[in-house]
Structure formats: C-alpha cells, structure tokens
C-alpha cells in the first residue's frame, strides 16, 4: 500500500544519508592480517575489575618495539613555562615545511613512550612536514584538565615558534590518535574562543572518542558490537574515563560532542575503524561539524581495529590512511 504521508517521506529522506553511512563500513569480517596479529600477540580481554587491580605502570607503558631511526632527525625540547616535553621531527632538514602537531593516544594514561617515536619520524617523512609530538601530562597523577591544558599551551607555543625548527606557522595541522584526537577536538574549541582558531588549517581525528559519557557507552551500537575481543574494549574505555575524568564526562572538553557551537572550527578528516567501540563517535561528531558548515571528510576502515592497530606500515590500510592525510593537507594548506 502506498504511503503519501509527507512527514514520513521527509523523515525517511533525512535518515537515508545516515543509514547509508552505517552500511558502508565492512561486513563484520576481520581483516585476515589483523586476525593474525591478535593471534600472534596472544590477545586476551581484561575485565574492568582486572584493569582496576593491575599496577598502573603496566598500563602506562605498553610494550611497543623500538625501531631505529636517525637520531639527528629529532630534537627534544621543553616548551612554555611549565616545561612540557615535545619531540620535534624534521628528517628532511628543510625550512618552510607544514607543521603537524601530534597528540598521542593511550587512554589519557600513557605518556609519549619511546616505541611511538619511529612512527612519528615516519609521519614527518610521509607528509614532508615538521612533526611536533607533545608529551602532555597523564592520569592518574594528573587528571582532567591537565592534558587539555598542556595540549593547548603547546599548540600556542608551537604556533608562534615552529619556524625555528623548519616549520611554516601558516600551515598548521593538528593530528590526534584516540585520546589525542579527543584533545585535538578540545584544542580547536579553545582556539576558536580565543580568536586564534584560524591558525589551524586542518584537524585529523583518528579513532576519536567524542562522547565519554557512560550512557553513551551503554547505548552506542559500536560499543555493543565491539565491547570485547578487538584489542580496544569497552572496559578499557570505562577505565580510561574513571582514571582521567571520573566526574567530568559531561564537560565538553571531555566529551567534545557536547559543545554548544561547532561553527568556525577547522576542516576535519575523521577516520574510524569497523571493529572499534568508538566507531560511531566519528560519524556523530562529523554530523555536528557538517551541520555547522565545517568541511569534513570521513573514512571508516573495514575489517580494522581502533586507530588501525596491528596494520603494518606496508599494508593497504596504512597506505590509504597516508594518502587520505596527504590529500587533506593538499586541499587545505594551499589556501
């Protein structure tokens, strides 16, 4: 029977773009290489109770292989009056390069561990940029808003001083993985309110936790689908929030999707993965940006884990990620 209800037709038409997005990311089949990665490392889930019982040092310092790179390609500096540690990678040893300010992941608990340095060096080479990696303070020793304060203060300092290290301060990109993506979202809001948001030409949000409220974790489809078994678990997300911001998850600087106004924020590249509890946060945040007139490009990687964990540098997924970032930089840094 035909339905000519105009309100129903409009509702369905309005939902079609979102339904289409939900159907684009894979078929619930884990990439064989990623399945092999989980087998090789002997991955096992930990419950929230087990995480709480573990010595925090075991979670703070993940065992990431130390891959060599030329030490002359990095400078170790401290910035602002708070002496925030920053690593500066310029393997091209050139001037007037784009500036990437990188904020690492780790659930607001892990510092910038040495095992991440090789990938940061590779980023500087891949994107022909100067990469500033910020070692912001982490929980539980330093709870919210310490990480946001350090991240924003570092951005301000780098935006004024990047040329001393070969960077072009007119070509600034903020890039964050997981907790780092959350910090990037907070920084862009602070910068906009301070009248310096236009200094940021692009934000790259990989594995963004946009909504850290418990009720969201209990109702989001991606949290329900990927609660366990895929490296980043719902229990880990809960533990990170209760360690970092146990009572502040309604604050827009903890759950950036709760911000009152998204207009005037920098263009965004938002990357998600099929087997990530936080997968749905990306499209939800992208919808907020798009509705406010912000240019957004989204990509969900089918068959992959949170932040493409386990995908080797030579993998198709990593090559595609690098290409996405290069194209976004080309689009927004040339203006």
Regions found by a protein language model. Give the residues of each.
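Alpha/beta-hydrolase superfamily serine-hydrolase fold, recognizing
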Residues: 25-335
């Amino acid at each position: 029977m035909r339905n000519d209800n105009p309100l129903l037709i409009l509702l369905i038409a309005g939902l079609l773009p979102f339904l289409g997005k939900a159907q684009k990311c894979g078929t619930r089949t884990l990439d064989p290489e990623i399945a092999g990665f989980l087998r090789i490392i002997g991955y096992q889930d930990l419950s929230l109770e087990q995480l709480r019982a573990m010595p925090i040092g075991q979670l703070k310092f993940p065992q990431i292989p130390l891959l060599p790179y030329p030490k002359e390609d990095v400078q170790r500096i401290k910035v602002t009056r708070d002496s925030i540690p920053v690593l500066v990678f310029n393997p091209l040893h050139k001037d007037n390069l784009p500036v990437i300010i990188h904020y690492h992941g780790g659930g607001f608990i892990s510092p910038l561990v040495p095992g991440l340095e090789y990938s940061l060096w590779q980023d500087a080479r891949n994107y022909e940029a100067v990469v500033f990696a910020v070692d912001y303070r982490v929980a539980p020793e330093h709870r919210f808003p310490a990480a946001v304060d350090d991240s924003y203060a570092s951005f301000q300092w780098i935006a004024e001083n990047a040329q001393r290290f070969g960077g072009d301060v007119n070509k600034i990109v903020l890039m964050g993985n997981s907790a780092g993506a959350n910090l990037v979202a907070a920084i862009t809001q602070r910068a906009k309110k301070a009248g310096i948001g236009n200094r940021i030409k692009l934000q790259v949000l990989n594995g963004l936790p946009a909504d850290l409220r418990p009720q969201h974790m209990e109702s989001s489809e991606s949290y329900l689908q990927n609660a366990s078994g895929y490296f980043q678990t719902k229990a880990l997300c809960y533990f990170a929030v209760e360690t970092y911001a146990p009572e502040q998850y309604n604050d827009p600087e903890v759950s950036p999707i709760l911000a009152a106004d998204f207009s005037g924020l920098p263009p965004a590249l938002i990357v998600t993965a099929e087997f990530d509890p936080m997968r749905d946060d990306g499209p939800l945040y992208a919808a907020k940006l798009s509705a406010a007139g912000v240019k957004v490009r989204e990509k969900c990687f089918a068959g992959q884990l949170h932040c493409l964990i386990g995908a080797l540098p030579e993998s198709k997924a990593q090559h595609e990620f690098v290409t996405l970032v290069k194209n976004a930089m080309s689009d927004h840094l040339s203006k």
